C-alpha cells in the first residue's frame, strides 16, 4: 500500500482529517491533521486539534508504519496552524468567509476587466473567500479584496482619504496552484493559542 494511502486510512480511521504529508531529505515525516469538517457548524463551535490528538495519531502511525516497513527517521504529527493549506472543495466550503492567500497557475490575463487596476500578469492575491456562480458545472469561488496602500507604523490615516474600491476575481479549483488561510493572528477565532505538535524519533 502506498505511504499516502496508509497514512490517510490510519488518520481517518481514528476520526481525524489528513491535511498534508511532507517528507524531507533528512528523513523527517511530517503529518498534519485536523478535525473533520461538519457542514452547518456554528461559528466558534468548531473543535481544534490538541496535543492529545497528536499523540494518539503518532502512536498509531508508528505501529502501522513499522508493519508496512516505511522508511523515516523522525515522525512529526501536528495541527495545521494559522496558514492551513486549502486543497479540496470541502476545504473551500469550510473556510468560506475567511481571509486567504491564493496563487493562480497562470496570470489572470483577460480576466483583468477594462478599467481594472489589477495587472494582467498578477498571480497572487489576498482577500476574503466567497462562493460564486458555478463555472461549467464546477463549484465557483471568488476572492474579494481592496488594494489599500500599506500604512507605516505611526502614520496617521486621513479621514478624508477615499477607500480603495473592492475588487473580485472568480476562479475554480482547477485554476489554483496554491491556496492557504492568510496567517492572521486571531486567538478568538480560527486557532487556539497553542498549536499542537508531537515529534518522535523512530
UniProtKB/Swiss-Prot annotation:
Keyword Acyltransferase: no
Top-level lineage group: Bacteria
Main location: cytoplasm
Family, as annotated: Belongs to the RimP family.
Disulfide bonds: none
Pfam families recorded: RimP_N
Phylogenetic lineage: Bacteria, Pseudomonadati, Pseudomonadota, Betaproteobacteria, Burkholderiales
Name of the protein this chain belongs to: Ribosome maturation factor RimP
GO cellular component: cytosol
UniProt keywords, alphabetically: Cytoplasm, Ribosome biogenesis
SUPFAM superfamilies the UniProt entry points to: YhbC-like, C-terminal domain, YhbC-like, N-terminal domain
Subcellular location per the Swiss-Prot or TrEMBL entry: Cytoplasm
Biological function: Required for maturation of 30S ribosomal subunits.
Alphabetical list of Gene3D superfamilies matching this protein: RimP-like superfamily, N-terminal
Swiss-Prot/TrEMBL GO biological process terms: ribosomal small subunit assembly; translation
PANTHER family the record matches: RIBOSOME MATURATION FACTOR RIMP
Coiled coil start-end: none
